[in-house]
Amino acid sequence: ADREPNHFVA
């Protein structure tokens, strides 16, 4: 997802 509250992309 793009605007998810728990989306971490390191």
Curated annotation (Swiss-Prot):
<protein>
    <recommendedName>
        <fullName>17 kDa cell wall protein</fullName>
    </recommendedName>
</protein>
<dbReference type="GO" id="GO:0005576">
    <property type="term" value="C:extracellular region"/>
</dbReference>
<keyword id="KW-0134">Cell wall</keyword>
<keyword id="KW-0964">Secreted</keyword>
